């Protein structure tokens, strides 16, 4: 029985070694095809005539009239004449985010003002005894009278 467990142990370690060697010898290259590397440090062959592309430049965008207004309203520029011909997308995103925050603050302020206005109007209506209960009772009485008048005419 001892030799059987030793055989399993040897087979398992052999399998792990083979798996490690196979996975390290097959690697993806830049062109996404499998290439066999013999365990040495080999670099993929690149054509020497191919120009290397560098993407260090920030992509620029010509702003529309609406985007120019957003740049001015957000406080990035004072006048439309100061806005350059092309601006970075990050600058536009920052201006849009600033405008979103300003609009949300405005909406919060309008909501608070609306709530205060409704509280004041509700207190005035309560002083005039215009509650929902009294309004509903008056409406039901009026509907009953109309139904009685309609029944008399028929």
Curated annotation (Swiss-Prot):
It is a single-pass membrane protein. Residues 76-102 are annotated as: Required for proapoptotic activity. InterPro entries: DUF1075 (IPR009432). The keyword Transmembrane applies. Induction: By 17-beta-estradiol. By hypoxia. It holds the Pfam family DUF1075. GO terms for biological process: cellular response to hypoxia; neuron apoptotic process; positive regulation of apoptotic process; positive regulation of release of cytochrome c from mitochondria. Keywords: Apoptosis, Membrane, Mitochondrion, Transmembrane, Transmembrane helix. The chain crosses the membrane at residues 103-120. This is Protein FAM162A. It comes from Homo sapiens (Human).
């Amino acid at each position: 029985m001892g030799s059987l467990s030793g055989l399993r142990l040897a087979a398992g370690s052999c399998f792990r070694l083979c798996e490690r060697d196979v996975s390290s010898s097959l690697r993806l290259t830049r062109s996404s095809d499998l290439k066999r590397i013999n365990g040495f440090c080999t670099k993929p062959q690149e054509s020497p005539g191919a120009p290397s592309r560098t993407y260090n430049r920030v992509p620029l965008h010509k702003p529309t009239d609406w985007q120019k207004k957003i740049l001015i309203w957000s406080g990035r520029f004072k006048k439309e004449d100061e806005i350059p011909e092309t601006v970075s997308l990050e600058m536009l995103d920052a201006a849009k985010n600033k405008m979103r925050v300003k609009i949300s603050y405005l909406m919060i302020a309008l909501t608070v003002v609306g709530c205060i206005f409704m509280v004041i109007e509700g207190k005035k209506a309560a002083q005039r005894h215009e509650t929902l209960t009294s309004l509903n009772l008056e409406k039901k009485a009026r509907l009953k009278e109309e139904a009685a008048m309609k029944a008399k005419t028929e």
